[in-house]
């Protein structure tokens, strides 16, 4: 039924087979052997192997590059099939053009005319990808050095046009910029599955300054579909994050549609709260909406962290005492080290605890009540929840097997001297 519906309702490709060739590149693939592969639809004319052509972009029409089409592929299911030519309406993959980008148009040299294309939004947030230097570094990952991490990030640039990678003052740290936390979390998860081990910092937004030196920040339009009973909670949370309600209306199925204008930093760490507040039934989509004057400070987290004071293995006796101070992220047997965040404090301060502390053995016979220590099950954070949770003075340690939150400065004395404060 779906295939028949597509045939009945989707219009046939429009274009002139006798006109000059026009192929708009809409996505990029990458192959270790042939390099970048541009994928797009033939809008006009016909594209052939060994044909001379020009690559031109709608937003930079003066920059033109002469190329020769070395390979053409069409798609048969998930496989690429070599073809000699591609006609109107064909979705075609083109290899042999080293510096091809989304939005480029392939056309004949005699009549270079670029197809209109919406400019890709610039990155609005960044995170630092850092070589893991914790006491447990190198035990779980296969690729752990700065060279491994750098090569993997640069390879990602071949297919992800919204990503930016920059060097920093430290050779062990790279500034990675993207369109949002979700964008970067997908990259982090992919690297984790490929056996990379590294640490990431809290997401930060890009600020700009106008000609008068006034601070500007990126803004987002947030479109939200939420069940009617959760509307109040969502509006309240977003207004606390400097969001402005632009529009509100009822839609089918007992849902309300909200439109917010909100700073990009106001959405950092919010998706997890949003899913909790709506019990997983809300839908949140965002779109970049330019730069506007800075809206003021935003309080991200009202609670502190529970920090391990001693390195070793967490035991029931130590965890039983610690769980009274907040919500734990680890259970008995977990490896911990000094400066590692083991839970969320119920107060707005950081507390150091010794979860490796065992009960001292004495000659006094213990009662059964002393032996039956009941632990509350730990809260196991997903990658997105961990990225949302970390504060400005913390890092997320990412390995193929574990996610650990830690302080940037592990030594408690040095940490106090540095004077890190909560936002």
Give names to the regions the model predicted:
Residues 1-423:
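Structural and coupling elements of P-loop NTPases
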């Amino acid at each position: 039924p779906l295939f028949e519906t597509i045939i009945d309702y989707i219009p046939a490709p429009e274009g002139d087979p006798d006109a000059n060739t026009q192929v708009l590149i809409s996505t990029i693939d990458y192959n270790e052997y042939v390099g970048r592969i541009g994928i797009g639809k033939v809008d006009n004319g016909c594209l052939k192997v060994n044909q001379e052509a020009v690559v031109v972009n709608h937003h930079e029409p003066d920059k033109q590059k002469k190329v020769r089409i070395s390979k053409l592929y069409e798609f048969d299911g998930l496989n690429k099939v070599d073809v000699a030519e591609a006609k109107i309406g064909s979705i075609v993959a083109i290899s042999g053009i080293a510096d091809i980008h989304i939005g480029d148009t392939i056309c004949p040299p005699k009549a270079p005319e670029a197809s209109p294309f919406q400019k890709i939004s610039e990155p609005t947030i960044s995170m630092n990808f850092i070589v893991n230097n914790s006491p447990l570094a190198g035990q779980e990952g296969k690729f752990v050095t700065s060279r491994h991490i750098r090569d993997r990030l640069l390879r990602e640039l071949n297919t992800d046009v919204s990503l930016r990678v920059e060097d920093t003052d430290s050779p062990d740290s790279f500034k990675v910029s993207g369109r949002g936390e979700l964008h970067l979390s997908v990259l982090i998860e992919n690297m984790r599955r490929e056996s990379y081990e590294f640490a990431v910092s809290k997401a930060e937004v890009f600020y700009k300054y106008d000609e008068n030196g006034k601070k500007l920040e990126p803004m987002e339009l947030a479109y939200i579909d939420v069940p009617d009973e959760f509307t109040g909670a969502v509006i309240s949370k977003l207004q606390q994050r400097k969001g402005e309600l632009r529009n509100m209306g009822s839609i089918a199925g007992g849902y309300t549609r909200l439109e917010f204008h909100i700073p990009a930093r106001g959405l950092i760490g919010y998706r997890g709260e949003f899913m909790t507040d709506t019990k997983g039934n809300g839908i949140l989509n965002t779109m970049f909406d330019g730069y506007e004057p800075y809206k003021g400070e935003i309080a991200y987290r009202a609670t502190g962290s529970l920090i391990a004071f001693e390195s070793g293995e967490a035991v029931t006796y130590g965890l039983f005492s610690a769980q009274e101070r907040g919500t734990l992220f680890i259970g008995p047997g977990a490896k911990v080290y000094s400066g590692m965040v083991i839970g969320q404090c119920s107060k707005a301060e950081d507390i150091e605890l010794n979860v490796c502390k065992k009960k001292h053995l004495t000659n006094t016979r213990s009662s059964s009540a002393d032996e039956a220590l009941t632990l509350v099950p730990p809260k196991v954070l997903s990658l997105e929840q961990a990225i949302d949770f970390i504060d400005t003075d913390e890092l997320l340690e990412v390995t193929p097997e574990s996610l650990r939150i830690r302080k940037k400065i592990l030594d408690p004395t040095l940490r106090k001297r540095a004077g890190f404060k909560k936002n």
